A protein has these predicted regions:
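Intrinsically disordered, low-complexity regulatory regions
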Residues: 1-77
Length: 77
């Protein structure tokens, strides 16, 4: 069983494949880019009761787009 607080499975799947957790990548990035990468990497790996898996994946990708757009808007200021 995964540790839902310290090592949730929707973030640690990458460790099983590559030996690195999502946080090991995103902690070195600014907030918007780190969150965009986080949502991209967890897309398709997080399930939530009451949500269709495809709907959850789309939601995560939309969140990533939001953070990318926010980063672009900050750079344009």
């Amino acid at each position: 069983m995964s540790d839902k607080v310290n090592h949730p499975s929707h973030y640690t799947w990458l460790k099983e494949k590559c030996g690195i957790e999502v946080i090991d990548i995103t902690r070195h990035m600014d907030f918007d880019l780190g969150n965009a990468i986080k949502y991209i990497l967890r897309a398709g790996h997080k399930s939530e009761e009451g949500y269709d898996a495809r709907e959850k994946q789309i939601e995560d990708l939309r969140k990533a787009i939001w953070y990318i757009n926010d980063e672009i808007n900050n750079l344009l200021k």
